[in-house]
Amino acid sequence: MQERIDAYFDTLARLTRGAEATDRGGKPLALARGFEIVRDAAHAAHDGGNKIMFVGNGGSAGIASHLAIDFSKNGILRSMAFNDAAALTCLGNDLGYDNVFAAQLEFHARTGDVLIAISSSGRSRNILAAVEVARNKDCRVATFSGFGEDNELRRMGDVNFYIRSREYGFVEVAHLALCHAILDLDMGWGAKKIEAKRAMVELDG
């Protein structure tokens, strides 16, 4: 059993560290550059009186809600998710489930906002529709996907993060870890340790 546990967490770590970032044209980006694009877009939105919006289904919806409160409370960045039960059931009933997020973006999105679109498969119609609305409203878009490398969502963001796995658990946890890393590193996680190491190297030199 321990070998399987070790293999599980080794795989999760490998997939997260191996996350692939690309631009809208499919050009590979360094992961650090991908993080910078999201960070800069988030700060530009906040400074301009705009907001960050998160969308996802199922486990990805949980991630969206989790991140919206963390980006708001810890990052001091205006953020929201669209997972209210009344809104989802109303819009799903009236407009169809493919439109539950797109309709809310029509209500709330403004030029200069940022959309974080999360889908393990990268093929969820309601997520793709939400991105289309965000694009039409001149929002910045970051996507998080997995499963097939040719999924549609991966080609729709200003920056696109992809986890090379077809296992829901691995993809979802990696997506959450990446988003947390973007926020936590922006807030200075590890900076003091790095500065201390540099100081030690300079002293030794």
Predicted regions and their residues:
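Conserved N-terminal alpha-helical segment that immediately precedes and caps sugar-phosphate-binding
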Residues: 1-205
